[in-house]
Design a protein with these regions (language model features):
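Formylglycine-dependent sulfatase
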Residues: 1-138
Length: 138
C-alpha cells in the first residue's frame, strides 16, 4: 500500500508563529499535533515573491528564471512538469484544497476555455476539491 502524502502550503504564515516552533505567545494545538507526526522545514526560503510564482517554484522545483511565471497570473509553460503531474505518473491522485495562483499555458487551450480568463484555476495535474475564490469572504 502506498503511503499517503499530505503537503500543506499556506500563504503568509510566519514559520516561527506556532507553538510547536517555540513561539512564546502563539497557541496552535491542532497544528502542534499534526507537526508531531510530520516533517517540518525550518531552513528554507522563498525563491520569489509574490505567492503565485513562489508556489510555482515550489511545485515545479524550478528557479523563477527557468519557469518564467514571475507574476500572479503568469501562465506556466505546459512543457514543465510539477509535483502533481509526477505524482500521477506513480499512481497518486493529487487533490488541491485551496488555490495555486497559476494559469494554464494558453497555447494549448481552446480560445474560449474558461481557464484563459482566470489565474484561479488549479495548477495542471491537480484536481480541485475545495476552492475559495479571492475576494469572497468565508
Amino acid at each position: 500500500m502506498k503511503k499517503s502524502i499530505l503537503f500543506i502550503c499556506v500563504d503568509q504564515w510566519r514559520w516561527d508563529c506556532f507553538s510547536f516552533m517555540k513561539h512564546k505567545n502563539a497557541l496552535s494545538p491542532n497544528l502542534d499535533k499534526l507537526a508531531e507526526e510530520s516533517t517540518t522545514f525550518t531552513s528554507h526560503f522563498a525563491g520569489i515573491v509574490p505567492c503565485g510564482p513562489a508556489r510555482t517554484t515550489m511545485l515545479t522545483g524550478l528557479y523563477p528564471f527557468i519557469h518564467r511565471s514571475v507574476t500572479n497570473g503568469a501562465p506556466l509553460d505546459k512543457r514543465f512538469t510539477n509535483i502533481a503531474k509526477e505524482a500521477r505518473k506513480i499512481g497518486y491522485d493529487p487533490k488541491l484544497y485551496g488555490y495555486t495562483d497559476t494559469s494554464w499555458d494558453p497555447r494549448y487551450l481552446d480560445p474560449e476555455d474558461e481557464k484563459n480568463f482566470t489565474y484561479e484555476s488549479p495548477m495542471e495535474g491537480f484536481d480541485s476539491v475545495c476552492h475559495l475564490p479571492e475576494g469572497n469572504p468565508v
